[in-house]
């Protein structure tokens, strides 16, 4: 199987369970919302410094369990976060563990930060991708990076929630990058059920990140939910990957909503 399997979780105990179930794990994705759900964070409030210390402790534990894998660690970025602030956070987080991919949002500032970071050898995972144009912008902004250094994370479930076929986005990104140099890998994210997981395997996504519940269902060969029939398809766009990244339309309401949600979950952990 060419597709790598990641666990989507901010809990090292789930990493242990996934390793026990699957025998191997290629990586893990974390984000502020998942860290806020970590059992050790429940009902607690931290200073900003303590939150980062807690996040570091969690990813260090995960990294120790899957030292050969990738662990995605997300910067705190709201719509006003400056490029320099993202870069500085990313550099700091990159020192936490030797196998990190730093998650940045697909916004103008996020892409500028990513472009600078890959030139310094820092690996990135560009998150909250909801359009093929956003994925193309990631490719163009990170030119010169090597395979394995850049992930783009199309979010399936959140498009499905809007009655749009999120799997089409994954398929279109995989197809588009066939014409590229291979430096960006498609990391299918926001899988909601076993159908999503299996469909991404079939369409050849480079990586799939799924929660523990779905990985268990997959391993146990549980019944697969029916393909939804009420979703609006997403047509393929013929995009020129050689264009400057600034020429692609990177705006999407779900990217903005996703950033707001991550920030809100993070802020709830912090003492007023």
Predicted regions and their residues:
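Active-site beta->alpha loop and helix N-cap motifs at the rims of alpha/beta catalytic domains
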Residues: 1-6, 11-15, 21-25, 30-119
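Alpha-helix-loop-beta-strand connector modules within alpha/beta enzyme cores
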Residues: 50-70, 94-96, 115-124, 167-182, ...
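Well-formed, non-transmembrane alpha-helical positions, independent of function
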Residues: 17-18, 92, 116, 137, ...
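Generic secondary-structure signature for well-ordered alpha-helical cores
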Residues: 60-64, 95, 143-144, 171, ...
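Structural motif
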Residues: 23, 65-66, 120, 141, ...
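Catalytic alpha/beta core domains of metabolic enzymes, predominantly
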Residues: 108, 125-239
């Amino acid at each position: 199987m060419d597709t790598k399997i990641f666990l989507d979780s901010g809990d090292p105990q789930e990493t242990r369970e996934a390793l026990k179930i699957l025998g191997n794990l290629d990586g893990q994705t974390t984000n502020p919302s998942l860290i806020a759900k970590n059992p050790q964070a429940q009902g607690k409030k931290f200073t900003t410094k303590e939150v980062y210390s807690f996040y570091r402790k969690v990813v260090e534990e995960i990294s120790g369990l899957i030292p050969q894998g990738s662990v995605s660690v997300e910067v705190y970025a709201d719509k006003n976060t400056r490029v320099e602030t993202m870069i500085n956070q990313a550099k700091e987080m990159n020192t936490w563990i030797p196998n990190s991919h730093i998650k940045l949002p697909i916004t103008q500032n996020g892409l500028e930060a990513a472009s600078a970071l890959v030139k310094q050898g820092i690996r990135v995972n560009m998150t909250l991708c909801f359009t093929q144009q956003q994925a193309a912008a990631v490719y163009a902004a990170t030119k010169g990076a090597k395979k394995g250094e850049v992930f783009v994370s199309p979010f399936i479930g959140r498009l499905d929630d809007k009655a749009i076929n999120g799997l089409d986005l994954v398929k279109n990104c995989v197809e588009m990058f066939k014409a590229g140099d291979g430096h960006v890998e498609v990391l299918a994210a926001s899988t909601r059920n076993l159908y999503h997981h299996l469909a991404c395997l079939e369409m050849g996504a480079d990586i799939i990140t799924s929660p523990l519940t779905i990985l268990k269902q997959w391993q146990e060969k549980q019944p697969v939910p029916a393909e939804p029939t009420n979703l609006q398809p997403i047509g393929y766009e013929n995009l020129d990957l050689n264009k400057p990244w600034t020429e692609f339309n990177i705006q999407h309401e779900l990217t903005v909503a996703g950033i707001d949600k991550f920030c809100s979950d993070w802020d709830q952990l912090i003492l007023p």
